[in-house]
């Protein structure tokens, strides 16, 4: 019996070592031989918060607990990464997941991109192979809290889509892709072009299932995982914790060994079944520790090694005797395979539960417990409540006592120095547990029950810098430095946000500036189009109509023709009609045409009006001599206060009807009557100017010779009237000189001006004045003027200052016509409107008068 046990133990140990280097791929009776870079799925972070990252070129992934039922409410994920430029091929070998419509209960997904599903499967049908388009693949498995099934088992292989040649254990597809030889003729298209299934019709045959002799009563039939053929194995290899059969038939449906006990002492020990040998698969043990003391219980695992294949084996430790999830202290798995492991309860009671799956096994664990402050019989107290240490732990280079008592005075180290190991290297206490290795083997940073100031103590008795706590990186190795961290935005994120905000603000300011600049340029262009024309452009664009034929004849520029209308006692001339129309529209007000847009300036208009009164400028339209003069002065003042009544064109007067002319009031409010004949008083002329009188007399006699009627009314011999006439003639002489000088200077710049334009010096000499005045020619109806003289326009007396001269003259001698502008020149007998001959100017009396008085024009 002892010999048999020895043989079984040796076989068990050999199988355990083989499991560390070999892995079988179970699928349709075929076995793929994988290299040392093969990944075998086990208990890992795949079913935790983060996915398990796999970088091996090939491997096997199984669901938790396969081939047993997977647990409920699990979420596992794997991330397979291949080399750049390679693709990943996944082939399912076993698949049994709870089925549902659209796979909403339990499901398996394969994704090329995270959170973007490209493949979802459930049920009992083996899915077809999956060939990725990228160098990475996400695999996710989910189960609900209802039905559980066997799960899945898949194999993956990564390589280039086209390769010139393949390895000896690989098959080259028709498209140049390489796959494992075991995938050939397995009724699945792993190549993508079905070339691995084309040559299977003739040579394909099922795995070796030839008949063999029945096994003995103490043997069982098994498909050997080593020879790939069915063989008979002794019953002793069944349920021994070692997998001998390819289908795991020797380790399935084994009876659970009884283990566990109730511990009621202040200290004690316990271990896994068969320790230090492998514990049986499917072990399920519970230890209840009740010291009967209120003090804490210290549980220490001196040796710990669990299996990690499948869902894995675990040890759960509870604070108390109840299996209460809220009082779970710690869960130990295959990833905690390091010693010592210490767990401290809050009371004198602890519950330890060990569970193993039915796949493979490991050495197990050995644990001790004791009440805080007590030591085991074979231990040495560290002093106070610092714990205990064994003789083997004395001077081994590792602190088993928090105060380092087990490492004091061990070697040739100085006082307050500790050895790194037995090689004689020492370090001071200040270098202990400061996250800086001073010993070659790092013993100064192991078993750190306390850390130096500025360091953080991890749950696995390691020390890290405090600045590394809650930095989103696992520096402790167990994630304890990232637990219970407040949600704080990293400084880098804040800096990036501030810089981004500044850049965005700067771009916004630049955009606003550009927008404002473009808007200003646009408005400037629009204003440039809307700007009023300058005075020069206005003069060039606003051409005046050429003078009429009658005006040219009246000015003496062309000789008269026979068929042109002439003045007669019974018919008014065309110019007289024009004069009457303008007078009816303006009410004896001077026509003032705006030169530029600045005519709206009231101050310039007031200034020009004052200048016209004091500088000798003449109004162009006046009332008749027979009309009441006092009302004319008040009417002129009233009309001057109307700035827009003068804005009428001369051409518009020709369209007035006869009724409008008849009904339009003149200066005195009546209808404008034909002008009376004018005979210059001979006595007054002779008294004033000799030569001028002779000329006037000759002109008068010439008129009588032609048969024209002349008024017989003579001028009164009253001395005041003669004095006023003399003063008026003197002022007329000065005005004629001024007009000659002005017209001579502006003749070169006003060639295109109409005779109806102004003769004001302010307008003809400068372009800055705003208003111009028109001289309206009139026609006299006297019969003593010949046809040529009647065709010429007559000047009207426009100065308000001569009213005193005209009123007494008319009042004293109603039969005699007062001296005004409506008449021929005393010198030549012609009515001058634009230019006055030099002979007429030389014949006038050179009498200087005040500028404040009105000037009479010939």
Swiss-Prot record:
The lineage of its organism: Eukaryota, Metazoa, Chordata, Craniata, Vertebrata. GO terms for cellular component: clathrin-coated pit; plasma membrane. PANTHER family: MEMBRANE FRIZZLED-RELATED PROTEIN, OVOCHYMASE-RELATED. May interact with RACK1, ZFYVE9 and NMRK2. It is a single-pass type I membrane protein. Residues 1-32 form the signal peptide. The gene is Lrp12. This is Low-density lipoprotein receptor-related protein 12. Keywords: Coated pit, Disulfide bond, Endocytosis, Glycoprotein, Membrane, Receptor, Repeat, Signal, Transmembrane, Transmembrane helix. Disulfide bonds join 47-76, 103-122, 166-178, 173-191, 185-200, 215-232, 222-245, 239-254, 259-285, 375-388, 382-401, 395-410, 413-426, 420-439, 433-448, 451-463, 458-476, 470-485.
